UniProtKB/Swiss-Prot annotation:
Belongs to the RraB family. Pfam families: RraB. It comes from Aeromonas salmonicida (strain A449). The keyword Calcium does not apply. This is Regulator of ribonuclease activity B. Interacts with the C-terminal region of Rne. Keywords: Cytoplasm. GO terms for cellular component: cytoplasm.
Amino acid sequence: MSLDMQEWRAETTAIVNELLADGSNPDLEYDIEHHFACQDFDQLEKAAVDLFKAGFEVTDAEEMELDDGAPIFCFDATIERKLDIETIVADIEKMLPILKKYGVDYDGWGTYFQE
């Protein structure tokens, strides 16, 4: 497992454990939102298409501004999952080669508390 994947596994474990410790329902499906960014809109769009083909629902890209004023484009890819560490990590492992292919940065994932 690459260092990046070890870091994403550790972060995923922490997020899932914190949600469950706060009382989030382990039996429900959650909208897992994966976040992406790239300064090249065309490359970002190509990654979004590939992620859609891989089974993720993708949002429209948004343009934002970095601290130095440079533009950056962002979007999310969402999929319904239980709060299962192995499943979420497997999704990340599936996405990383697509992102590397297009030079898109992965900015982690999140979801919302559910009782």
